[in-house]
């Protein structure tokens, strides 16, 4: 079981701290095993210990564990496949937070079968999220935001694992859209 104290100890062993980093209101943790992202904010001692929100995600067996600061973000990013991800934020090297893949850079061209895998190990190593969640990271987490990716099979995180939404592969009018996408054109 990984507690915040255990994460703090692991973070410290990597030469890092849970202490406030100026300009960064959030600290993101990814539990690769559980398929959850937990966003922490600052407590009264200026440490990232207060769970703020949780998101369901999909990593992969090649998703690295460790500690980084996000170096860059993109509205759309070419991914392996080739396919595309919306609201991509680089974690480290070629690993990103991004939406479930799209066949093209069009919001109605979602790989809908992949959307239905959210919450499971389904990626080639990146962290996939629903559009509403990855857009939140893109909009609210400045470049340099600290990220920790770890494994804990016993508990998804302090806020649990959120439920997932599914697309209906038979519904041709809606299946190409991420159902969480706030775009007004989303059916």
Listing of model-derived features with the role each one plays in the protein:
Residues 1-6, 185-187:
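N-terminal secretory targeting signals
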Residues 6-110, 183:
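Gly/Pro-biased beta-strand-loop elements
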Residues 74-187:
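Exported/periplasmic cell-wall-interacting domains
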């Amino acid at each position: 079981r990984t507690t915040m104290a255990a994460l703090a100890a692991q973070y410290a062993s990597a030469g890092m701290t849970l202490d406030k980093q100026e300009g960064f209101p959030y600290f993101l943790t990814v539990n690769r095993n559980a398929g959850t992202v937990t966003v922490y904010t600052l407590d009264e001692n200026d440490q990232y210990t207060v769970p703020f929100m949780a998101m369901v995600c999909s990593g992969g067996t090649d998703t690295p564990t460790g500690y980084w600061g996000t170096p860059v973000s993109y509205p759309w990013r070419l991914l392996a496949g080739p396919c595309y991800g919306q609201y991509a934020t680089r974690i480290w090297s070629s690993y990103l937070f991004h939406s479930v893949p799209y066949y093209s850079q069009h919001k109605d061209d979602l790989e809908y079968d992949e959307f239905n895998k959210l919450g499971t190990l389904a990626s080639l190593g990146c962290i996939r999220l629903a559009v509403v969640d990855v857009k939140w990271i893109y909009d609210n987490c400045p470049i340099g935001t600290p990220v920790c990716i770890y494994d804990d099979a016993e508990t998804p995180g302090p806020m649990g694992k959120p439920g997932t939404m599914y697309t209906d592969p038979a519904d041709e009018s809606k299946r190409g859209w991420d159902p969480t996408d706030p775009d007004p054109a989303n059916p």
